């Protein structure tokens, strides 16, 4: 778990939902420095690779960008192989002294697979097609799990889960960015 430090940049909630031929990653736009909101419209969900992978990141911003860049390099090395690229990144993350100190997590998805890349170098797949990370991750995860068996679309579930997390978590706001892909 990331420890709270008043001089560290925190925040964010990222959620992913895979349902009915769609995969969605949604995230809020808040960046906090200690207990102060520094920015409300940061973009923490984006397309990477050749646009066929979506990623959302939580944790300290510089660390998250470092990992995102490393994942993009692995995707260039292993095109159209998100699982392989993620495992190779995790190997680096676990063995490189510099990378081991990074405080960030990512959710990544392509048409075939959704993965969480953790700060300990784990690569995890969701059990029920939903996963969430970040300061409001537990709230978003609970909301998404409650909604996954309804007739709502993947995007509707992700947006509702993010709004619930933003209502509860002080490090999450309602400025929600959503990226989606067709899924197999």
UniProtKB/Swiss-Prot annotation:
> Which leading EC class covers this enzyme?
hydrolase
> What does the entry list as the binding residues for Na(+)?
166, 169, 172
Which Pfam families does the entry mention? Proteasome
Give the signal peptide, or none: none
Q: Which reaction(s) are listed as its catalytic activity? A: ATP-dependent cleavage of peptide bonds with broad specificity
Give the keywords, sorted: Allosteric enzyme, Cytoplasm, Hydrolase, Metal-binding, Protease, Sodium, Threonine protease
Is the keyword Methyltransferase assigned to this protein? no
Name the job this protein performs: Protease subunit of a proteasome-like degradation complex believed to be a general protein degrading machinery.
Record-given protein name: ATP-dependent protease subunit HslV
Q: Which organism is it from?
A: Brucella abortus (strain 2308)
């Amino acid at each position: 778990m990331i420890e709270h430090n008043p001089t560290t940049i925190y925040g964010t909630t990222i959620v992913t939902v895979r349902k009915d031929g769609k995969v969605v990653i949604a995230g809020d736009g808040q960046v906090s420095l200690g207990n102060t909101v520094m920015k409300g419209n940061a973009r923490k969900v984006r397309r990477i690779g050749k646009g066929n992978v979506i990623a959302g990141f939580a944790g300290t911003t510089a660390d998250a960008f470092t990992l995102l860049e490393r994942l993009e390099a692995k995707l260039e090395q292993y095109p159209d192989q998100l699982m392989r690229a993620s495992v190779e990144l995790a190997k680096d993350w676990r063995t490189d002294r510099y990378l081991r100190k990074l405080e960030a997590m990512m959710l990544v998805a392509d048409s075939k697979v959704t993965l969480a890349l953790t700060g300990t170098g784990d690569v995890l797949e969701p059990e029920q097609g939903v996963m969430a990370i970040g300061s409001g991750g537990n709230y978003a995860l609970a909301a998404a799990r409650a909604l996954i068996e309804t007739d709502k679309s993947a995007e509707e579930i992700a947006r509702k889960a993010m709004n619930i997390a933003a209502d509860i978590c002080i490090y999450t706001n309602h400025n929600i960015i959503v990226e989606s892909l067709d899924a197999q």
